[in-house]
Amino acid sequence: MSRRGLVAGPDLEYFQRRYFTPAEVAQHNRPEDLWVSYLGRVYDLTSLAQAYKGNLLLKPIVEVAGQDISHWFDPKTRDIRKHIDPLTGCLRYCTPRGRFVHVPPQLPCSDWANDFGKPWWQGSYYEVGRLSAKTRSIRIINTLTSQEHTLEVGVLESIWEILHRYLPYNTHAASYTWKYEGKNLNMDFTLEENGIRDEEEEFDYLSMDGTLHTPAILLYFNDDLTEL
């Protein structure tokens, strides 16, 4: 991806989005591309899956690839839920799907390697961002080409983050002025902060289909000397 030329803002070559939608997480549902979400965060476990490829302990994780697994965790401790093991009477991790990577065996075992450091669910090593608790749709219209695209975005995403989502449709999106109802958008603000209200609850209250009215952002091309 080329740099942004004369347009003010972050260098999109290194730009990192903060939020991911559940639909985006769901797309990463294979052992070679494995994401999960839990407790409001999104994690890329692809490297973990590659490191334990062929290991039976990976099976419960592969089965939930692309899904939210918050129910595996105690929200207070952010650790795997625990229970009293009926066989040993000891407090152990609760794994209804079966024991998985980094969970100790039920009984003492001499061949269990515990030199991996922190378990994969502790710390932020695999974290790639936050899970959008609420999403909304927004239309983006390129006034130069009359092309229109509808994106699902997180309500807490800035316009810069929405622009980053839009890049697959227009690699020069940063060379445009983004406007709503004739006013320039503050690219560091969210849609709501820019006056683009989320009216989903009002439509629900009125028993109306909210998809019939999706706000539109208009893009106006700037000749900023970037490559066309």
Swiss-Prot record:
The keyword Heme applies. It is found in: Cytoplasm, Cytoskeleton, Cilium axoneme. Keywords: Cell projection, Cytoplasm, Cytoskeleton, Heme, Iron, Metal-binding. It comes from the Eukaryota. GO terms for cellular component: cell projection; cytoplasm; cytoskeleton. Gene3D superfamilies: Cytochrome b5-like heme/steroid binding domain. InterPro entries: Cyt_B5-like_heme/steroid-bd, Cyt_B5-like_heme/steroid_sf, Cytochrome_b5_domain. Belongs to the cytochrome b5 family. This is Cytochrome b5 domain-containing protein 1. The lineage of its organism: Eukaryota, Metazoa, Chordata, Craniata, Vertebrata. The gene is CYB5D1.
